[in-house]
Amino acid sequence: MSTQGFLKPRSIEVEPVGTHHAKIVMEPFERGYGHTLGNALRRILLSSMTGYAPTEVQMTGVVHEYSTIPGVREDVVDILLNLKGVVFKLHNRDEVTLVLRKNGAGTVVASDIELPHDVEIINPDHLICNLTEAGKVEMQIKVEKGRGYVPGNVRALSEDRTHTIGRIVLDASFSPVRRVSYAVESARVEQRTDLDKLVLDIETNGVISPEEAVRQSARILMDQISVFAALEGAGDSYEAPVRGTPQIDPVLLRPVDDLELTVRSANCLKAENIYYIGDLIQRTENELLKTPNLGRKSLNEIKEVLAARGLTLGMKLENWPPLGLERP
């Protein structure tokens, strides 16, 4: 079947909005293709971009994350949260262990981390902790390359390592895309007024630019769709490569707290043993409405936050829950 009759975008514009934030406008598309491609690209941008994140930390004198360090204003939990906000970029390597040492009164920021020549920090002024006169902090930070969001407990079980006292495994958010949304507007070509204009609004953490993020997501989509092109022709056959353990969308492994629901809605879900987004999307509207103290208003709130992530209630998941997923 020929696809020559389908319109392709003749105009692609990148409109900078701020630092690492841009709108990418493409037109024209055949009617309906704006939503078809916009939603697909958005979901890939949110879940499948490769980035870098701290995955393990060892601090001198610290046994576990609920400790405190003498002379340091923040406790260890706050320090770890601040470390997660440091944006790393590795060149020509997949992992690295970095060292941070500092003592004496003052602030400790990302630029105080000792870096080899092929590691870069995008936000060097990011605060890690504050020290008093007697304060001292020394730590090793392991940074890895990865994709999506991987909870620390899942990764710790999949990595057959001997547990070291003081080794703290972090939840890792590798995605360099902080926010993405799309809108479809009307476009016109000559006498045709029923066409689509796609506007992608993308903000990244600086590891990649918004336009590079779109290029990478498009390549991923093309690679996945190419499998279906092999079905063309009755005599042709295609043998898909054998896969190992089924992959779970990293978004589904996030706790429902990440949806930023109201306290009432979040507590109602946890009372029904719904702790992860993957648990939630498998419930139907009727099932949730039977939950004590969860009314129509809370249900609408849940549906809205799921829709913003391209998800709905009543979805079916295979191989859920994944092996090693902990329940609170």
Swiss-Prot record:
InterPro entries assigned: DNA-dir_RNA_pol_insert (IPR011262), DNA-dir_RNA_pol_RpoA/D/Rpb3 (IPR011263), DNA-dir_RpoA (IPR011773), RBP11-like (IPR036603), RNAP_asu_C (IPR011260), RNApol_insert_sf (IPR036643)
Chain segments carrying region Alpha C-terminal domain (alpha-CTD): 248-328
GO BP terms in the entry: DNA-templated transcription
Covalent S-S links between cysteines: none
Reaction equations catalysed: RNA(n) + a ribonucleoside 5'-triphosphate = RNA(n+1) + diphosphate
Presence of keyword Protein biosynthesis: no
UniProt keywords, alphabetically: DNA-directed RNA polymerase, Nucleotidyltransferase, Transcription, Transferase
MF GO annotations: DNA binding; DNA-directed RNA polymerase activity; protein dimerization activity
GO terms for cellular component: cytoplasm; DNA-directed RNA polymerase complex
Any matching Pfam family: RNA_pol_A_CTD
Domain comment in the entry: The N-terminal domain is essential for RNAP assembly and basal transcription, whereas the C-terminal domain is involved in interaction with transcriptional regulators and with upstream promoter elements.
Family per similarity comment: Belongs to the RNA polymerase alpha chain family.
NCBIfam families listed in its UniProt record: PRK05182.1-2, PRK05182.2-5, rpoA
Role summary: DNA-dependent RNA polymerase catalyzes the transcription of DNA into RNA using the four ribonucleoside triphosphates as substrates.
Protein's recorded name: DNA-directed RNA polymerase subunit alpha
Phylogenetic classification of the source organism: Bacteria, Pseudomonadati, Pseudomonadota, Betaproteobacteria, Burkholderiales
